[in-house]
């Protein structure tokens, strides 16, 4: 088919960007054609129309105004589409024929900058992953804040490392080289977190490219260099001067508390389990921030709790100083409220997409900094230190205040941006325009008098410019100097040479004004760009104060206390509470529990009790309190002395991975294998109902062996909830294990959960009573009780002296190990060079006989 020149140009550009919806610039609109139009009209809910595309045929078309394109781009990208921006690369006024066009940007889920109406308290991370053998490198950036972070590590289980990092960072998009990875493995992880995967090719100039963009440690491994280079190349593809992206931070995974991906989900750190929203999560409880920068920093705190005691204390002390001064807390809150997202504004300035309204938002935010500095100058050491570092950016405020009108338009090329008295040249052009319009008014009045047409009027529209409108009844009064340009039903429109002269004076002035205002705005934007690092530092400090104030308010509202920190492995908390659950049931209704675990004597708590009795709440609250401690927060308790924990692992509830065809039990065993492999004596393990996914004896045996292994080989602080009451015998066998139970009050026909965790054990599961509370039919409950009574009467319950068997088996295992070691040493000591062939055969026969006598 012979397309029109413009459609042919569109098709050629689209061919190079098949995976994108192409926004094709035509005048004041971005147009979409063919399949893109069908998709965009549906997703954006805009009118679908048609356009001639050649040979009298039409193609689907829809369009959006260019000056509001960011809204529509965000909508499409949030639904998983990529958007390519095809701009006019020449001024249509200066070109005859087809305007040259080309791609200037491609927006993907992680490379779009949200508009002012978006939830900018979230990060919008792009992640890059590279690997070689057992080394993996991970880098990530939120292009709207410009922060580049990267790490590398070696592991036999690379995909577990990747999954753990993804669960913390929650990127919108991951780029990787599919020659390095098992695509299926990455797809499984990405689908779990709803992340877009994009394949890229590794470059050959990694170090040179990185150094041309950011400050970077050149001693990193080749894998790390490739990873960071891929990240930056993806960001800088169509925009080479993003000045806000200029530095990088290397972090080490073991420098922070490690929270595996299951724990991030099970503990509801960032989102709740049921609606996947922030409400009902730990973040939701803590978040009283007033700025988007503060909200994102709080996310970062929860992603990576600290391990360094001194750093934790600095955060805690800031929170304490604000907590103890409620007036300061309220004043800080009021001052922070209304500060715009400075990180996003910096990014828009760097992208050269900031408009005059963005500069006013920057001015309004900077205006609050002197008040903030004054509040922080309060003789409180840690808070005051932030205030002293805070740049008031007065010069930038003054520049914007003197130059930009208070309520500017969004469009930058139609004037009304710059205040009077800022530019003499602009003031003169405006004076000329005013004179021209005065002259126009005088000409209209003189023509009314000269022709005797009282309703004659001079009107303007974009198509005709200025013209004289004369009603039909007065057309006979018009002179020969009137040149007709348009005939309407009730009037006609005319031009005269004098009107054209006045029009030229006005329009020439307006064109010059628009051009000059835009140039002045660009100059102002350039000056601000040169000071982005100063604005960024102030934004970071504002975020720190905002988070400190937020944590202080949370502590004030919820009656938290400042914990002491120890390094000898003890977690000792009085009247602890679950920070999330207590808000749903009410603090007065929540049953508190003391926590005492660690320091070698009671490293393992074996907890028995029925379902719904409060075991899981207790398990989770211990872990959450440790996390709160290490982000520098106060904790929900009356007193606390908490050791620094290096890792938190949880195995709570079933999580069948049907996508991979794995059963509950297989998933459970894989997770336990991971925990046993990576846990240390400084870790906290939260384990609920291990072994329940298989037969009773298999499950009991595995649970027993796991507890023993943790006790003897790992020595981690462990909360182990179980229905296997036989395991309580382990308290007699293991010095670092104690039995705990959930208190139950029994009546004649029901039970009451007291939700109090105390020393001791229970040998009843109360399963029938729980079923009754859950609303099972009374006839069914009655039948179940009858069956249980008969079982107890007939003593059909198997009495398994498992503790005796376990001890006996362990002794036999130890004996076998020693015999095998002696046998191995005997073989190693044979010198084959000093014996004859006959002796060799005799020795081999003896070894076979000895081997047959050894245990399995």
UniProtKB/Swiss-Prot annotation:
<dbReference type="Pfam" id="PF01624">
    <property type="entry name" value="MutS_I"/>
</dbReference>
<dbReference type="GO" id="GO:0030983">
    <property type="term" value="F:mismatched DNA binding"/>
</dbReference>
<comment type="similarity">
    <text>Belongs to the DNA mismatch repair MutS family.</text>
</comment>
<dbReference type="InterPro" id="IPR000432">
    <property type="entry name" value="DNA_mismatch_repair_MutS_C"/>
</dbReference>
<dbReference type="InterPro" id="IPR017261">
    <property type="entry name" value="DNA_mismatch_repair_MutS/MSH"/>
</dbReference>
<feature type="binding site">
    <location>
        <begin position="609"/>
        <end position="616"/>
    </location>
    <ligand>
        <name>ATP</name>
    </ligand>
</feature>
<keyword id="KW-0227">DNA damage</keyword>
<dbReference type="GO" id="GO:0140664">
    <property type="term" value="F:ATP-dependent DNA damage sensor activity"/>
</dbReference>
<comment type="function">
    <text>This protein is involved in the repair of mismatches in DNA. It is possible that it carries out the mismatch recognition step. This protein has a weak ATPase activity.</text>
</comment>
<protein>
    <recommendedName>
        <fullName>DNA mismatch repair protein MutS</fullName>
    </recommendedName>
</protein>
<dbReference type="GO" id="GO:0005524">
    <property type="term" value="F:ATP binding"/>
</dbReference>
<dbReference type="InterPro" id="IPR045076">
    <property type="entry name" value="MutS"/>
</dbReference>
<dbReference type="InterPro" id="IPR007695">
    <property type="entry name" value="DNA_mismatch_repair_MutS-lik_N"/>
</dbReference>
<keyword id="KW-0238">DNA-binding</keyword>
<dbReference type="InterPro" id="IPR036187">
    <property type="entry name" value="DNA_mismatch_repair_MutS_sf"/>
</dbReference>
<dbReference type="GO" id="GO:0003684">
    <property type="term" value="F:damaged DNA binding"/>
</dbReference>
<dbReference type="Pfam" id="PF00488">
    <property type="entry name" value="MutS_V"/>
</dbReference>
<dbReference type="InterPro" id="IPR005748">
    <property type="entry name" value="DNA_mismatch_repair_MutS"/>
</dbReference>
<keyword id="KW-0067">ATP-binding</keyword>
<dbReference type="InterPro" id="IPR007861">
    <property type="entry name" value="DNA_mismatch_repair_MutS_clamp"/>
</dbReference>
<keyword id="KW-0547">Nucleotide-binding</keyword>
<dbReference type="InterPro" id="IPR036678">
    <property type="entry name" value="MutS_con_dom_sf"/>
</dbReference>
<dbReference type="GO" id="GO:0006298">
    <property type="term" value="P:mismatch repair"/>
</dbReference>
<dbReference type="InterPro" id="IPR007696">
    <property type="entry name" value="DNA_mismatch_repair_MutS_core"/>
</dbReference>
<dbReference type="GO" id="GO:0005829">
    <property type="term" value="C:cytosol"/>
</dbReference>
<dbReference type="InterPro" id="IPR007860">
    <property type="entry name" value="DNA_mmatch_repair_MutS_con_dom"/>
</dbReference>
<dbReference type="Pfam" id="PF05190">
    <property type="entry name" value="MutS_IV"/>
</dbReference>
<dbReference type="Pfam" id="PF05188">
    <property type="entry name" value="MutS_II"/>
</dbReference>
<dbReference type="Pfam" id="PF05192">
    <property type="entry name" value="MutS_III"/>
</dbReference>
<dbReference type="InterPro" id="IPR016151">
    <property type="entry name" value="DNA_mismatch_repair_MutS_N"/>
</dbReference>
<dbReference type="InterPro" id="IPR027417">
    <property type="entry name" value="P-loop_NTPase"/>
</dbReference>
<keyword id="KW-0234">DNA repair</keyword>
């Amino acid at each position: 088919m012979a397309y029109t020149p413009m459609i042919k140009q569109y098709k050629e550009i689209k061919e190079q960007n098949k995976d994108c919806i192409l926004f094709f610039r035509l005048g004041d609109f971005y147009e979409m054609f063919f399949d893109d139009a069908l998709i965009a009209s549906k997703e954006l809910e805009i009118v679908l129309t048609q356009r001639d595309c050649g040979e009298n045929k039409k193609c689907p078309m829809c369009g959006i105004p260019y000056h509001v394109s960011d809204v529509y781009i965000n909508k499409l990208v949030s639904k998983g589409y990529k958007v390519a921006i095809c701009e006019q690369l020449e001024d249509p006024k200066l070109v005859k024929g087809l305007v040259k066009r080309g791609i200037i940007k491609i927006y993907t889920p992680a490379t779009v900058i949200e508009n002012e109406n978006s939830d900018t308290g979230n990060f919008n991370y792009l992640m890059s992953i590279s690997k070689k053998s057992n080394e993996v490198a991970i880098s990530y950036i939120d292009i709207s804040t410009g922060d580049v972070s990267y790490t590398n590590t070696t592991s036999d289980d690379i995909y577990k490392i990747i999954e753990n990092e993804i669960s913390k960072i929650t990127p919108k998009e991951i780029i990787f080289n599919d020659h390095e990875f098992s695509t299926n493995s990455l797809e499984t992880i990405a689908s779990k977190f709803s992340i877009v995967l994009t394949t890229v090719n590794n470059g050959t100039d990694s170090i040179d490219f990185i150094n041309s963009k950011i400050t970077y440690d050149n001693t990193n491994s080749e894998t790390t260099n490739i990873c960071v280079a891929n990240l930056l190349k993806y960001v800088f593809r169509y925009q080479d001067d993003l000045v806000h992206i200029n530095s990088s931070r290397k972090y080490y995974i073991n420098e922070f508390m490690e929270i595996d991906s299951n724990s991030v989900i099970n503990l509801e750190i960032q989102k709740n389990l049921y609606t996947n929203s922030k409400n009902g999560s730990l973040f939701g409880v803590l978040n009283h921030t007033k700025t988007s920068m503060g909200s994102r920093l709080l996310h970062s705190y929860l992603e990576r709790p600290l391990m360094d005691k001194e750093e934790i204390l600095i955060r805690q002390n800031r929170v304490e100083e604000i907590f103890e001064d409620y007036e300061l807390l309220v004043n800080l809150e009021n001052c922070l409220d209304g500060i715009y997202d400075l990180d996003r504004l910096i990014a828009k300035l760097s992208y050269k997409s900031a408009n005059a309204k963005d500069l006013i938002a920057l001015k309004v935010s900077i205006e609050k900094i002197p008040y903030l500095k004054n509040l922080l100058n309060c003789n409180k050491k840690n808070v005051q230190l932030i205030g002293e570092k805070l740049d008031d950016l007065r010069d930038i405020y003054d520049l914007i205040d003197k130059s930009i009108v208070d309520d500017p338009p969004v469009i930058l090329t139609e004037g009304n941006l710059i205040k009077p008295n800022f530019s003499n040249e602009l003031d003169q052009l405006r004076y000329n325009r005013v004179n021209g319009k005065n002259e126009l008014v005088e000409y209209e009045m003189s023509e009314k008098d000269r022709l005797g047409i009282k309703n004659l009027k001079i009107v303007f529209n974009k198509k005709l410019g200025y013209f004289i409108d004369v009603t039909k009844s007065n057309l006979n009064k018009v002179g020969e100097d009137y040149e007709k340009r348009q005939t309407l039903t009730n009037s006609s429109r005319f031009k005269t040479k004098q009107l054209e002269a006045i029009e030229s004076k006005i329009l020439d002035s307006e064109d010059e004004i628009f051009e000059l205002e835009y140039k002045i705005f660009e100059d102002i934007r350039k000056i601000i760009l040169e000071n982005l690092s100063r604005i960024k530092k102030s934004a970071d400090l504002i975020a720190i104060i905002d988070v400190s104030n937020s944590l202080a308010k949370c502590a004030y509202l919820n009656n938290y206390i400042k914990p002491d920190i120890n390094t000898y492995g003890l977690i000792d908390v009085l009247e602890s509470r679950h920070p999330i659950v207590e808000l749903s049931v009410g603090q007065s209704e929540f049953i508190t529990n003391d926590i005492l675990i660690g320091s070698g004597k009671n490293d393992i708590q074996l907890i028995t009790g029925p379902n719904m009795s409060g075991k899981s709440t207790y398990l989770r609250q211990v872990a959450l309190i440790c996390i709160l401690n290490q982000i520098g927060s106060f904790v929900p308790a009356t007193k606390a002395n908490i050791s620094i924990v290096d890792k938190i692992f949880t195995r709570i509830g079933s999580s069948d991975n049907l996508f991979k065809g794995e059963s509950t039990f297989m998933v459970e065993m894989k997770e336990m294998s991971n925990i046993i492999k990576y846990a240390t004596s400084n870790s906290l393990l939260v384990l609920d109902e291990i072994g329940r996914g298989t037969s009773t004896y298999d499950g009991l045996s595995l649970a027993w062996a796991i507890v023993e292994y943790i006790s003897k080989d790992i020595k981690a602080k462990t909360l182990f909830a179980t229905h296997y009451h036989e395991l309580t015998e382990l308290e007699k066998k293991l010095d670092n294990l104690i039995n705990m139970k959930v208190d139950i009050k029994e009546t004649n026909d029901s039970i009451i959960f007291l939700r109090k965790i105390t020393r001791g054990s229970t040998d009843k599961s109360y399963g029938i009573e729980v079923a009754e509370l859950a609303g099972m039919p009374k006839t069914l409950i009655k039948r179940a009780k009858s069956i249980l009574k008969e079982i107890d009467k007939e003593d059909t319950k198997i009495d398994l002296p498992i503790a005796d068997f376990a001890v006996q088996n362990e002794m036999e295992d130890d004996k076998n190990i020693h015999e095998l070691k002696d046998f191995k040493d005997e073989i190693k000591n044979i010198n084959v060079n000093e014996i004859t062939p006959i002796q060799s055969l005799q020795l081999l026969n003896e070894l076979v006989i000895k081997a047959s006598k050894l245990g399995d």
